């Protein structure tokens, strides 16, 4: 065989090997195109999917900034310096359906809901291989139901009218009971139907948490106390006052926490990343997070929002909340931690809210119990303001 023929044979063989290898490479399934039924197979798959849900939930486009800011920006406690345009339209009640913050909340709320729906659907058919695997997946399902209810509640209240006899038949949001295929036609349902699904998801979250072997989770996750806290908030909005009182008490008991009563403890809730005795569920941040303009902390003060001086003047001189609200700092609680002023853990449910829910519910129920309402109010107010004279608080409709 001549040298030319030898080289030709070698080249042909090399090309055949190369094409085969290339063909194998090109037929790899992209990681972003794995079908859901193949993506959620092992317990680790479900944990990974749930981590993705929490990432979406804590994004600055949802509970990491927008949802929390949109409730405070247009209120009487807030001023805007126009240092930037951030939330300025919302501050002035010039809210269009093209507002970027509104669009972000809608998109990220539904992305979180969709991911929860996928965990729930695939988890229902999970087959246990190793003992304990099923309980781990059922724990993921419990959290998925709880987060789905939480997101649906926020979206319903932002894109629907407040729950009432007059409003409950008006359009709310799109109910999601299972993953929605791409390009499907969907429709909004009534506010009443939204609330019905929210309560159903809360019930299912409790049922899954009650299953054998399912463990509770920490306060940076939707734990059992957080599920009860959500139920209390939802039922208060629905004017189901007895249900709100019961659910709030369940959250108080399950949390095992206490309301802080010193300036140092109050300040530490917002200037450190330590878990507080008041926390029920919070969006956890890391010390090295770099959020810059997207931080809720940056929005308050540097990017325009501040607590107005008239609000601060309402506090008693010894009120422990002045540890954060007093002085030259005008950004309220959101001053950040000592080593990174862009971050703070962001509370979603806290113990004081549960006592205040009970106070409002006792005062507004069909047969008001103003004595109980005052008692629950003082669980928070007396600890915040050591100078408070509880004898000055009347046991009548003015208690709230």
Language model feature labels by segment:
Residues 85-159, 189, 206-211, 243, ...:
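Conserved, well-structured interaction surfaces
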Residues 1-32:
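Bacterial Sec-dependent N-terminal signal peptides
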Residues 132-138, 158-192, 196:
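Short coil/linker segments at helix-helix boundaries
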């Amino acid at each position: 065989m001549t040298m030319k023929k030898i080289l030709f044979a070698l080249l042909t063989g090399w090309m055949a090997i190369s094409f085969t290898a290339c063909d194998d490479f090109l037929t790899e399934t992209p990681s972003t195109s794995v079908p859901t039924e193949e993506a959620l197979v092992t317990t680790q798959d479900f944990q990974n999917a749930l981590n993705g849900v929490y990432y979406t939930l804590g994004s600055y486009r949802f509970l990491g900034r927008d949802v929390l800011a949109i409730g405070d920006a247009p209120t009487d406690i807030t001023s805007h310096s126009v240092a930037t345009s951030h939330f300025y339209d919302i501050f002035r009640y010039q809210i269009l359906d093209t507002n970027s913050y509104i669009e972000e909340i809608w998109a990220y709320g539904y992305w979180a809901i969709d991911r929860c729906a996928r965990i729930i659907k695939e988890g229902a058919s999970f087959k246990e291989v190793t003992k304990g695997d099923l309980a781990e997946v059922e724990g993921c399902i419990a959290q998925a139901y709880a987060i789905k209810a939480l997101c649906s509640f926020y979206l319903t209240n932002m894109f629907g009218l407040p729950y009432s006899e007059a409003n409950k038949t008006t359009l709310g949001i799109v109910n999601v009971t299972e993953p929605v295929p791409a390009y499907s036609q969907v429709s909004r349902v009534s506010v009443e139907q939204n609330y019905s699904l929210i309560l159903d998801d809360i019930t299912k979250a409790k049922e899954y948490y009650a299953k054998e072997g399912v463990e509770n989770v920490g306060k940076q996750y939707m734990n059992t106390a957080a599920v009860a806290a959500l139920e209390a908030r939802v039922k208060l909005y629905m004017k189901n006052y007895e249900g709100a009182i019961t659910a709030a008490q369940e959250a108080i008991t399950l949390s095992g926490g206490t309301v802080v009563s010193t300036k140092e403890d109050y300040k530490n809730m917002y200037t450190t990343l330590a878990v507080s005795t008041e926390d029920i569920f919070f969006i956890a941040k890391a010390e090295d997070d770099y959020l810059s303009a997207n931080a809720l902390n940056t929005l308050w003060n540097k990017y325009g929002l501040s607590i107005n001086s008239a609000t601060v003047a309402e506090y008693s001189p010894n009120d422990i909340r002045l540890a954060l609200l007093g002085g030259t700092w005008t950004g309220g609680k959101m001053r950040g931690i000592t080593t990174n002023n862009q971050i703070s853990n962001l509370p979603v449910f806290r113990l004081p809210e549960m006592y205040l829910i009970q106070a409002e519910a006792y005062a507004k129920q069909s047969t008001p119990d103003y004595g109980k309402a005052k008692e629950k109010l003082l669980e928070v107010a007396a600890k915040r303001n050591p100078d408070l004279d509880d004898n000055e608080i009347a046991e009548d409709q003015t208690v709230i």
